[in-house]
C-alpha cells in the first residue's frame, strides 16, 4: 500500500511538472493589462528609488549627529568662556572693594579682571561665528540631500558680514583692554614711586578728607582707574559688576543643563524628523510595490492556467484530426484493394 501511494504521489508530481513545463501557445501573450501606465513605471523605477531614499535617510541622520557633535564642542567652549567671565566679574568686584585698603592690589585685580573679560568675550565671539559658519555648511549639505530653495548668494553675503562684525568687535575689545591695562600699569608704578601720593590717595578713598590740591593730583595721576573713582561711582560700578556676574552665572547654569541634556540643536531634530518621515514614506511605497507585484503574479498565474487549457484543447483537436485522416486513408486503401480484387 505504501509503495502504491508513493507511486501515485510521484505520478501526480510528474503530471504537475509536465503541466508546469508545458509550452504556452505561441499566439497568446501574457500581459499586465490591469496595471495603469503609472503603476508600470513605478514597478520599474522603485528599486532605484528605494536605494536613493535609503541613502538620503542615512545621510540625514549622519548629518544630524554631526551637527549635534559640533554644537556640543562649541557649547563646551562657551562654558569655558562664561566661566572665565564669572572669574573676571569676581576679580572686578574685589578690585573695587579693595581700592580703599590697597591701591596696588585694586589695580592688579582690576587689570586682571578686564583682561579675563576680554578673553571671554573674544572666545565667545569666535565660537559663535564658527558655529554659525558650521551651521550654514550643514544647511548646504542638507539642501544637497533634499533640495528646497537656493540661498547661496544671500548666505555668502551674510557670512562675510558676520566675519567683519566679529573682527570689529574683537579689535575694539582688545584695543580698550590694552588701553585700560596701560593706564593701570602706569598708575601702579606712580603709586610705588610716590609714597605721599599713595597716602593722599588712600585718605581720599577712605575718608575723603584731603586738600583740593591733593585731590587734583590724585585725579590727574590715576584718571581712568579705580583709584580715581568716587565712592558713589565705586558703588555704582559694584552694582553693575554684580549684575553682570549674576547674568554670567545664570548663563553658565543654562549651558551646563543644556550640555547634560545632550546639547541637541533644533536643526538636527528637524533633520531627524525628516529622516523619519522619509522612512515612513519608504515603508508605504514598499508595501505598494509588493502589492503590485502580487497583483502581477496573480494575473500571470490566471493567464497561465487559461493558456494551458487552450493549448490542451488545441492538442486534442489536432490529434483527433490526425486519427480521422488516418482512418480515411485506411478506408480508401481498403476500398481500392477490394476493387482490384474483384475486377
Swiss-Prot record:
Alphabetical GO biological process terms: lipid transport; lipoprotein metabolic process
What is the tissue specificity?
Answer: Widely expressed; highly expressed in the uterus, fetal brain and spinal cord, also detected in heart, liver, lung, colon, spleen, thymus, prostate, placenta, adrenal gland, salivary and mammary gland.
Q: Name one GO cellular component term.
A: extracellular region
Q: Where in the cell is it found?
A: Cytoplasm
Print the keywords alphabetically.
Answer: Cytoplasm, Lipid transport, Transport
Question: Region annotation Disordered: residue ranges?
Answer: 1-24
Which superkingdom? Eukaryota
GO terms (molecular function) for this protein are: lipid binding
Question: What's one Pfam family the UniProt record gives for this protein?
Answer: ApoL
Ranges of Basic and acidic residues compositional bias? 1-10
Q: Which InterPro entries match?
A: ApoL
| General function of this protein | May affect the movement of lipids in the cytoplasm or allow the binding of lipids to organelles.
| Homology family | Belongs to the apolipoprotein L family.
Q: Give the PANTHER family listed for this entry.
A: APOLIPOPROTEIN L, APOLIPOPROTEIN L6
Protein name per Swiss-Prot or TrEMBL? Apolipoprotein L6
Source organism: Homo sapiens
